[in-house]
Every structure is written in C-alpha cells, then in structure tokens.
Curated annotation (Swiss-Prot):
Keyword set includes Coiled coil: no
Protein name: Putative phosphite transport system permease protein HtxC
Gene3D superfamilies for this protein: MetI-like
InterPro entries: MetI-like, MetI-like_sf, PhnE/PtxC
One Pfam family, short name: BPD_transp_1
UniProt subcellular location: Cell inner membrane
GO cellular component entries: plasma membrane
Transmembrane regions: 23-43, 81-101, 130-150, 239-259
Keyword terms of this UniProt record: Cell inner membrane, Cell membrane, Membrane, Transmembrane, Transmembrane helix, Transport
Residues annotated as domain ABC transmembrane type-1: 77-260
Its job: Probably forms part of a binding-protein-dependent hypophosphite transporter.
Molecular function GO terms recorded: ABC-type phosphonate transporter activity
Gene name per UniProt: htxC
Keyword RNA-binding: no
Amino acid sequence: MNQRIEEVMLANVKRDVARRKRHFATSVVVLSLLAVAWYVCQIEFQKLGAGLPRLWSFVVQMFPPDLSDLDVILKGAGETLAMATIGTIFATIIAFPLALMAARNTCPNKWTYRVSRAILNASRGTETFVYALVFVAAVGFGPFSGVLAITFHMVGAIGKMFAEAIEPVDQGPLDALALTGASRAKIIRYGLIPDVMPHLIASVLYIWEFSVRTSTVLGIVGAGGIGQTLKDTVDLLEFNKMITVLAVVLLMVSAIDFISDRLRYLILDTKREGFETLPANN
C-alpha cells in the first residue's frame, strides 16, 4: 500500500516538474519573440520625448479651427458615408451565397466548403488599404475605387460572420421541409433565412459601421472620401483646417457607431422578446 502511494506521489512530482519545464520553455520563447519584435520596431522612447515639443507646436497651430472649407469637408464626409454604404451592400450581396457554401450544414460538398472558405479567408486577409491601392491603379482616382476596395475586403468579413450564424441553426425545421419535398432554394428561403435574419442584419450593421471608419482614410491613396481632404491639409501644413476635418470625422464616426449600436440592439432584443412571448406547451 505504501509503495503504491509512493508511486502515485512520484508520478505527480514528475508531472509537476514536466509542467514547470514546459511553462519555462514557453516563457523563454515568448520573451525571445518579444525581444526580437522590440528590436525590429526600433523602440526608442527618447525620440518620443524629443519630438513632444514639435508635436505641441502642431497642436497649437490647430487652433482656432478654420471653417472656411467646411462645405468641402462635409461633401467629403458624405462621399465617405456613401462609399461605405454602397460597398457594404455590394459585399453583402456577394457574401451571402458564399456563406451558404462555407457553412457545413448548407454546403453541397466538402470541396465547395473548402473553396468557399479559402475565398473568404483571402478576401478578408488583404486589408482595404491594399485593395484601394490596386483599384486606384486599375480604375483611377475617385470614390469608385474606394467602393471596390471596401467590397472586396468586406466580402470575407461578412461571409465569415454569416457562415458562423448559419452553422448553429437547428436542423429540425430544415429536415422537415426536406421531407415535404421542398427544393433546396425553398428550404433556405423558408427554413433558414427567417431563423438567422436578425443575426445577419446585425452583422451587416456592424460591418457598415466598420466600413465607415475604414473609408475615412482611403482618400489618402486617392480612393475618394474625406481622406483626400485630410491628406491635402497635412501636405499643405494647414493644421487649423486639419482639426476641422478630424472633428467632422469624429462626429460622423460617433454618430454611425451610435446608430448602428442602437439598431443592432433593437433587432437582437426584438428577436429575444419574440422567443420569450411564445406560449408554453401544455
């Protein structure tokens, strides 16, 4: 009996030692990677300290704000909002069929699933800014390049969110429709979409909000929107106009965030209330 207890204790000690070694090795690897990253990024806080007076001089030059070009700035803000809206709509139209093929419970076969997932990963794996550079070279300067950049990036983001909303759906109603002889299109239309629609709308609203924030800087590379105005003020050292542009961007993004957040809350809360008010089975 004592020998058995000693064996168990020895085994526990060995496991504890092995665990400590793994933790130590993991810590060494993580700290080494952080040290390499620190070196590569050339972190030098003394440069920040030396640059603070220059930064403060920029801040002083921002005031008072120059409102002489407010109409141009507001036009750029409207263009930015339009780019984000149209780009999100295009992305949603493309993403929905891809999401159906990228969800395990609705994809026709494993190859379709893998290809669709690869497309979505590639789409969202490339930043909107990179797409903007490509489309500016392809179709020229202007908001159309920004719309295309937002569309191509957001297809991957929306498609992934849609697929994740579709996969957990209860298969019971879908199987019941299939037993009645309903076509695949009707099963999706009457069995799947009503169940996931609130989550799909909430996802689109979130992406729209994100697209507005993203599109504010696309003008820096010539893809339209208020970013071009911001770049012009920086290039011309018009800091008092720059603060006006930044204020408009902040107000626009804050308003869109608030509207999107409220709409998502109302949509998802309505769905929860709908389930809560269902009559109980007797």
